[in-house]
Amino acid sequence: MKRFVVACATLAGVLSLVPLIIDAQQPPAAQRPELAILYTVDGFSDKAPGRVKLPNLEALMAQGAYFRQNWTVQTADPSNGFPPSPWAQNGYTSSIPNVVQMSGTAMLLPGKQKYVQDSFFPLKITAHVVNEISYRSLDGSFHYTAQAGGTGMRAAGYKVGNDKTLFWATTFLREVDPTFMWIHMQDTGVAAGESRNAPAGSPYKDNIWGEGSPYIKALQQQDVYLGQFVDTLKKTGKWEKTVMFITGDHGEQTAGGHPANVPEAWTMPLVMVGPGIKKGVTFDYTESIDTVPTLCYLMGVNPPLNADGRILAEALVNPPANVPPRQQKIKEINLLLLDIENVLAKLTAAPGAAPARGGQGRFSALRQAQQDYFDIERILEWHQFGTYDRFIEHHKELLARLKTMSPK
């Protein structure tokens, strides 16, 4: 316990210095954008820019920085299960990747976590627009919100699509002069699900890239809306002072959907454009936790205190000094957890291998291993490790232990 208290005290001391460090690294006020927009395309596959003609997105890619793969954590959504999961019991109503992206960290602090909008609220106007009610647990510290949609509302006859999101986004843009906006276009995620439910013989059955795919159509229509939104920014005189981050909340598997254990669902593109961002550059890798620290740096505000993503210095005209080199911790964690999941599945499927509730032998060892496994649905406990390196080390040791239990 003493070691834990000392560690917490040390962490508190470090965090107390964060505002001073960030302030020292922020760009001069004259160079800062006046509006930051996080523009989320639901279920935005990293393959989309290469497979679908998206002229408005392509134009922004040429004007800014393009990251081919933006990695998020495993794409679980434990918000709707029964009995309620710890995730739901802590009040979260969306999938895990949304919360991670808005926090700038995968080391979430249940009950205490702050989000990017808190970096502006209350003195700078914030706005959130989405055609889905699942993100309501992330809606704090937004002055203006328009959210409606989702499975239940559609079943009840409400037609709330991306067109409504565009309407409210442009309305807020004109009427309330926001400094930060989170715009979430939901229709692509809904359309991807139609591939799973398509009748047998359909060219897009279990294939979002098949001929006539609703997902492709939704991507193309969303690109039209993106162009219209950018036109509104230009007509209102805001474009030259706006920085935009266009990405997904998660990717999409070819069959449609975003199961936690499917790598296709973990990656989406990221396009950054606006003042302070290099033009016409392309990079291979980033992480969703990097978006908030980079956005906050450009806007001259402090990110959430526990945000540990990396400022994307390689994409910036005037990056801060001493940005650490690129690592791939989120990718490493995802693949490590997938390996553990696969080994556990084999062990528990072995004849008579149900974990015992006590006693000696391999069964009780397996039960202990399961308790030591902090999978994605236990993400609210990850912060107890303190760092990603410690989390990774723990799970590498767990994987090695599990492999010794494998049936001969």
Protein language model features and the residues they cover:
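Active-site nucleophile/metal-coordination loop of metallo-enzymes that catalyze phosphate/sulfate
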Residues: 26-33, 45-123
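Loop/turn elements at helix/coil->beta-strand transitions in domains of secreted/extracellular proteins
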Residues: 32-37, 63-68, 120-126, 175-183, ...
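Metal-dependent active-site segment of extracytoplasmic phospho-/sulfohydrolases and closely related
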Residues: 37-41, 56, 221-260, 295
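Catalytic-site neighborhoods of secreted/periplasmic enzymes
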Residues: 97-160
